[in-house]
Amino acid sequence: RLGKTAVSSVGGIPVPPVVRYIAGYQAGAKAAFPTVKTLNGYSQDFVAQDKCKNVALSQLAQGSAVVFQVAGGCGLGALDAAKEKGAWGIGVDADQYYVNDRVLTSAQKKVDVAVFTAILNQVKRNVFAGGSNLVFNAANGGVGLGKINAAVPADEVAKAKAVAWQVHLGKVDVPTTCANKGC
């Protein structure tokens, strides 16, 4: 309900991890509201908050109701822009709910889960897979949602959690690239 007309994303640089976040966000928005317009832009920076703020302000001027920042520290500028214009923001990596009262939630990398798993594998299981990577995703608890803003209606929270659970179970295929070169 919060972004039925248009939603947007501000990426730092279009590298694969950033594109995957944006692809999932756009697919989720389209699944919830098939006619929603999705906007995307890049700041070409992960640090300078003014660059992300400018990208977000442009998107907000085009009608975006929700801005998802996928630009590290630069993205804090996008969250500021959302608040400034009375729109909503979504944080990334860590729980950015604390940034301002217009942050809906955050797409979190659960680094604690990765660290705990690596330690558990070594200490309890005596397994050290040197030279290989552990991959964390929704299915193994490696990513998830941060705190959800109280402004989000309870029925919408329930729907979001139900979809997140379906992703966790592997029943929802989350795209890793955007349709029509949208990101």
Regions found by a protein language model. Give the residues of each.
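A residue-level marker of the well-folded mature domains of exported/periplasmic proteins
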Residues: 1-183
